[in-house]
Amino acid sequence: MEELWQKACNHFAVPEDVTKSWYTRIKHRLSESPSKRYYHNWNEMMQHKQVHLQHCKPALIIAAFFQYYTYDGVQPCAKANCAAFEEFCCDAVLADLESKNLILRLLGDELAENELHINFEDDANLLQDIDLVILAASSEDYKRYCQLLRQEYEHMSDADYKTMRLKVLQTLLSIPNVYTTSEFQKRYEAAARTNMKDEINSLKG
C-alpha cells in the first residue's frame, strides 16, 4: 500500500516528508483500536482493494485512501473525509486544482468545481466498483466480510439488521449489474450475485 501511495503522491510532486507523514497518519487512522471499523479498516478493506488500485490513476488512488478516513456506519462522513483531504492538500501545497476538485467530487463534495473533468463518472464508477469488489470474494472471505460487517452494526438488533441487510441485498440483485464498469462486470458479477444469494438464504434460514 505504501508503494501505491508514494506513486500517487510523486505524480503530484508532494514533498517526501508530507507523503510519509500522511501515509502513517492514514494507516494509523484506519487501524484505530478500539473502534467500530471491523471491516472498513486498513487490514481488511484496504488490503482487498490493493490489487485493484495498482493500475488506477493517481487521483483515484488518493481518493481511495481518504474515502473511509472517517467512518461511521450510522451517518455519512463525506464532509469529514473531504476536510481531511483538504488538510492534506494544504500540507502538500497541491497545485493541480483540477485533480483536487476531482478527488473532492469522488469523496462526495458535490459543490467542488468539475467543469473541465469530463471523465468524472468513469472515475466514480471505478471507485465504487473497487469498493464493492469484496462482494465477489471467495466464499470463505465473503463469510468473514459478513461477520465483520454485522459487528459494525452492533447497535442494531439481529432482527433489525437482518431486515436492513436483506433489503440492501435484494436491491442490489434487482438491478441489471452490481458493477458499473465492463471489466468488473465480466470478472466479478457472477461471483458477487452467488455470494449475495447465499447470504440471503443464510439470513432467511
Place the predicted regions along the sequence by residue.
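His-Asp-centered metal-binding catalytic motifs of divalent-metal-dependent phosphohydrolases/nucleases
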Residues: H48, K57-V74, N81, S99-L107
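Short, well-structured alpha-helical segments
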Residues: T19-H28, W42, I61, D96-L107
